[in-house]
């Protein structure tokens, strides 16, 4: 989509004009990037998706009795619909997937509709970090979902802004399920973000391909390498693509230079404790109703209420 491309160009210019360069993680998820991420979720080292799905199966048994009236499901950064499929039931009248990659949510929505033909699906292209005006026709009770530990992918405290805007989007008497990865052994974390199949590397290096396709930067993927490591003081996995040599490129006539070994941050994945997540939710105007986790306390899904 034209607007999607313009937003991408604007963000690249803004962030590459800084001494510490970064690409916001939401731009990973064009059609090709979203499919690369699906590959990551199948990697043996990447535990997040497997554990979260097990937890969602537990939640699915409770959701029917917890919410007795007809509901609308609103998923922020929906991407693939395999997780929401676990939770859908006859009381869900509307499903509104919100994502910055319209091509991918449109494709996913068609697949979901084949399995749930009576469900009214309204795929919505948007920057879900901001307030979104939902259709008036959907049900009063709105249940939001922000899964996959995406809450950890924000820079500079933006997760609080997201949660506040999600509350405005969903409105009064709403609920939000949030998946959060928990602090654990360094070795487990670093293996998850450096899988042996190389899926995480391809996922991150795909940003170079996207820059070439959408901005005509004429960069070569082989001139970059991928690294990801744990920043212990910040309890955060940080991923970068690193320029192997000095490179230059132009955007709208403006020259940009990458030094040899210069790092471009492409992902931040904050890890939480139960108390740090509850503190975040409270400071954003949400109340933690309850949470579910696996037996090893690797991962948790929190139910928030407005």
Put a short name on every predicted segment.
Residues 1-26:
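N-terminal auxiliary segments of SAM/dcSAM-dependent transferases
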Residues 20-64:
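Class I SAM-dependent methyltransferase Rossmann-like catalytic core
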Residues 69-79:
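Conserved class I S-adenosyl-L-methionine
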Residues 80-92:
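Conserved SAM-binding loop of SAM-dependent methyltransferases across substrates and taxa
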Residues 141-163:
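A short SAM/SAH-binding and catalytic strip from SAM-dependent methyltransferases
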Residues 160-172:
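A short glycine-rich, Lys/Arg-flanked "PGG" loop and its adjoining helix->strand segment in the class I
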Residues 169-183:
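Conserved beta-strand signature within the Rossmann-like core of class I S-adenosyl-L-methionine
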Residues 190-270, 274, 278-284:
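Substrate-binding/catalytic lobe of Class I Rossmann-like enzymes that use SAM or dcSAM, i.e.
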